């Protein structure tokens, strides 16, 4: 399994970031070819402090090659282009092969 974890930075309007992600960006991501799993959530902390990121998404493919093909596709290009519409504060994209500890 090959995974992408996308961590979105806080911006001037976190509610707008979450709304845009829910209504526009997540549906674009769901169209990526070959995607096996796509989950996301709004970050929080157990003690109520401000979390490091506003939201985090996790996407999975069978292989790195499948992920590369997904981002090279029309759907992938649309998702990347959409980042300028809501993620101006930045997003960290971490790609890796999944290893299980269990």
Task: Tell me the role of every PLM-derived stretch.
Residues 1-102:
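Macromolecular interaction modules
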